[in-house]
Regions:
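Kelch-like beta-propeller repeat domains
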Residues: 1-143
Length: 143
């Protein structure tokens, strides 16, 4: 259960670890998308809320130089995949849109490597979570 009883974002959130805390970012339930961000502190075994992000599920996330980056995802309520990139800087109280991927996609994975963040795979099609349509797309994001 996330956020002390609100477990609606447990389906398809992006996830990242920063400063010893686990971030569950966005998510969805049925055709509803959420922008909720929950932060888990394992040392205290407690959840807190973090700054909300524009609603999305199935996004990729990575940590680079102390910031969390979120890539794309899907808006089921709008039946579209997303290309935007958001950053949560250290100590920030809001997410900032910092760009867009060349190709909108969901279910892509983001990995920091050699000073860049690589976005791998994913689907270009909304509502394709149970289909077999993936991709071999690889993009690099230079923060």
């Amino acid at each position: 259960m996330l956020g002390g009883g609100d477990d609606r974002s447990t389906l398809a959130p992006a996830a990242a670890v920063l400063g010893g805390r686990l971030y569950a970012i966005g998510g969805r339930s049925g055709f509803d998308d959420f922008g909720s961000v929950y932060v888990y502190d394992p040392a205290a075994d407690k959840w807190a809320t973090g700054p909300s992000i524009p609603p999305r599920g199935t996004a990729g996330a990575a940590v680079h130089h102390g910031s969390i980056y979120v890539f794309g995802g899907e808006s089921q309520s709008r039946s579209r995949t997303l290309a935007d990139v958001y950053r949560l800087a250290p100590g920030a109280t809001r997410w900032v849109r910092v760009g867009a991927m060349p190709t909108a996609r969901n279910y892509a994975r983001a990995v920091p490597y050699r000073g860049k963040i690589w976005i791998v795979g994913g689907s270009r099609f909304a509502g394709d979570s149970h289909g077999a349509t993936g991709s071999t797309l690889v993009d690099r994001y230079v923060p």
